[in-house]
A protein has these predicted regions:
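Conserved alpha/beta enzyme-core scaffold
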Residues: 1-182
Length: 182
C-alpha cells in the first residue's frame, strides 16, 4: 500500500530475505542497491486499489477527516493507493471543529486524498470506531457463522443486508442487540 500511495511500482525491503518468502512466493523479485554497498533487497510490488472507503470519526464536507481512537489502521495508505477515494464519518462537522477535539495528529486525512464524503453514523459496524463505539463481537460471530453455510448466509442476508436503507440495517442491528427481531 505504501508503494502504491507513493505511485511507485515497488518498495525495496530487507524483510523476507533469508527466509522462505522467495520460495513460497516465486513471483517476487530482488533488486540491487544502486549505491556503493550494492545490497540485495526484496522488491515488494505496489498494491494498487481501484476504490477505497475508510470510516473516520469526523470529517468536513471538503474531505478533511479526523480519527479520535488509539490506532489509525493504515486508512491514509488505503486512500493513497486508490484511484477513487471516499470517507464515511460518524459526524460531518464544519472545518474549524476538526481542531477542537483531539490533537492535530488526528487529522491524517486531507481533502487532496478524498473524492467524496458521506455522514454515516455507526458506519464502521460491526468493527469499532473508538471512542464512539466498540466492536460488536456477537454480530461478528453471527456473520462469521453465517458465512460458513449457504442457507445460513441467505438468512443473514435477508435479515441485515437485503434491506432498503442504512436506517433499516441499523434498526435490525439494534433490535438484535436488544434481543428482539426487526
Amino acid at each position: 500500500l505504501y508503494a502504491a500511495s507513493l505511485r511507485l511500482p515497488f518498495l525495496p525491503t530487507r524483510a523476507g530475505l533469508g527466509s522462505d518468502v522467495m520460495t513460497l512466493q516465486p513471483w517476487l523479485r530482488t533488486v540491487r542497491s544502486p549505491y556503493a554497498d550494492e545490497e540485495e533487497l526484496l522488491a515488494v510490488p505496489a498494491i494498487e486499489l481501484d476504490l477505497a472507503i475508510v470510516h473516520m470519526n469526523r470529517a468536513d464536507a471538503k474531505g478533511n477527516a479526523q480519527f479520535l481512537g488509539p490506532d489509525f489502521f493504515f486508512d491514509d495508505l488505503f486512500l493513497g493507493a486508490a484511484k477513487r477515494r471516499f470517507v464515511s464519518c460518524e459526524k460531518l462537522v464544519p472545518t474549524e471543529e476538526l481542531t477542537r477535539e483531539g490533537s492535530f495528529h488526528t487529522l491524517r486525512i486531507h481533502r487532496g486524498m478524498v473524492d467524496g464524503v458521506v455522514e454515516t453514523p455507526r458506519g464502521a459496524h460491526f468493527t469499532e470506531c473508538p471512542p464512539d463505539y466498540g466492536r460488536d463481537e456477537a454480530f461478528q460471530s453471527e456473520y462469521a457463522n453465517a458465512a460458513r453455510d449457504a442457507e445460513a448466509w441467505s438468512s443473514f442476508e435477508g435479515r441485515y443486508l437485503a434491506l432498503e436503507s442504512e436506517a433499516e440495517y441499523q434498526r435490525a442491528v439494534a433490535a438484535r442487540a436488544a434481543g428482539g427481531a426487526r
